[in-house]
């Protein structure tokens, strides 16, 4: 608990305001899910990321709160591949919604909720009161609800901005980087050096990590020296040495460098030789997509998870399959 409080203060410091936040619950909130999308077209595809939430605002909320809801929707849209369209839904005029009013909640029961603001029926039914900008997770009627609150409009906007800019946006960069990093390994395995180089340097590929490095910069300055050393090593490999090896079409060197960079990621995420920087275990159903990506290239878990990176798993009772 003490560690969580310290991290929250550090996160909030860069925004110059205090924030009450259910850290683990907000980080692990089921924002998205994977589905088979575009059914009924030749492009029908599995593992498509779509929203797993409705963003709810009260019918009488202020324009500032409505704008904040749009900002959260913008970053959620960057994380997903689409809204879950199909010719059937379009023909029926049932294009899926993302933002709904508090009066529509009972009509749309198939997703979790992000409720932005306090002038709505959900907050009133829960009897919630807020003294400061707040991100709070509750459960009601069998689904998770992330409440974005505050004692006034200004504080609600601050909490919503934190959710959009620091939580969802960070996940966008993290998962784009992670999944494309696995694709780079697969391309190296098959000698597709140009494809690997392009994936490594693309802004939506591995370079998507630049978003996270920007967001983490205020915290990075306060990291212990041993953590900074590991991050510096990772950056040199990912952005200097590995691109060079790919240009040289040196397969063994590229695989070795990829492996070394993976180890640095494990050090930060699992606390190997340095303090553990990731304070929660990721959701298995979201994170484990990387296994299916690796499988498409003919790679198995053991091709990457061995030795110091042998650990594979998530929460207690769940493991990668």
From Swiss-Prot:
<dbReference type="InterPro" id="IPR018513">
    <property type="entry name" value="Cell_synthase_bac"/>
</dbReference>
<feature type="signal peptide">
    <location>
        <begin position="1"/>
        <end position="18"/>
    </location>
</feature>
<dbReference type="InterPro" id="IPR036280">
    <property type="entry name" value="Multihaem_cyt_sf"/>
</dbReference>
<keyword id="KW-0732">Signal</keyword>
<dbReference type="Pfam" id="PF03170">
    <property type="entry name" value="BcsB"/>
</dbReference>
<protein>
    <recommendedName>
        <fullName>Uncharacterized protein aq_2175</fullName>
    </recommendedName>
</protein>
<dbReference type="GO" id="GO:0016020">
    <property type="term" value="C:membrane"/>
</dbReference>
<dbReference type="GO" id="GO:0006011">
    <property type="term" value="P:UDP-alpha-D-glucose metabolic process"/>
</dbReference>
């Amino acid at each position: 608990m003490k560690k969580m409080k310290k991290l929250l203060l550090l996160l909030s410091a860069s925004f110059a305001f205090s924030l009450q936040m259910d850290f683990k619950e907000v980080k692990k909130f089921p924002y998205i899910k994977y589905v088979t999308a575009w059914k009924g077209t030749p492009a029908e595809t599995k593992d498509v990321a779509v929203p797993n939430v409705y963003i709810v605002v009260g019918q009488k909320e202020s324009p500032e709160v409505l704008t904040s809801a749009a900002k959260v929707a913008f970053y959620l849209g960057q994380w997903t591949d689409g809204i879950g369209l199909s010719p059937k839904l379009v023909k029926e005029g049932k294009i899926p919604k993302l933002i709904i009013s508090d009066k529509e909640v009972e009509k749309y029961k198939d997703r979790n909720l992000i409720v932005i603001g306090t002038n709505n029926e959900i907050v009133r039914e829960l009897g919630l009161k807020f003294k400061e900008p707040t991100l709070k997770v509750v459960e009601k009627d069998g689904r998770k609800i992330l409440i974005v609150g505050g004692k006034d409009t200004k504080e609600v906007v601050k909490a919503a901005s934190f959710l959009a800019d620091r939580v969802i946006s960070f996940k966008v960069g993290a998962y784009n980087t992670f999944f494309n990093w696995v694709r780079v390994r697969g391309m190296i395995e098959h000698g597709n050096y140009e494809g690997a180089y392009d994936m490594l340097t693309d802004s939506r590929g591995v370079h998507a990590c630049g978003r996270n490095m920007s967001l983490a910069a205020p915290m990075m300055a306060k990291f212990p020296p041993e953590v900074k050393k590991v991050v510096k090593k990772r950056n040199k490999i990912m952005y200097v040495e590995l691109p060079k090896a790919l240009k040289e079409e040196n397969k063994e060197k590229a695989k070795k460098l990829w492996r070394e960079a993976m180890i640095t990621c494990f050090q930060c995420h699992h606390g190997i030789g340095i303090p553990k920087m990731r304070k929660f275990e990721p959701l298995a159903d979201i994170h484990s997509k990387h296994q299916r990506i690796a499988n498409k290239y003919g790679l198995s878990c053991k091709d990457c998870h061995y030795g110091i990176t042998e650990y594979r798993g998530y929460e207690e009772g769940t493991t990668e399959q």
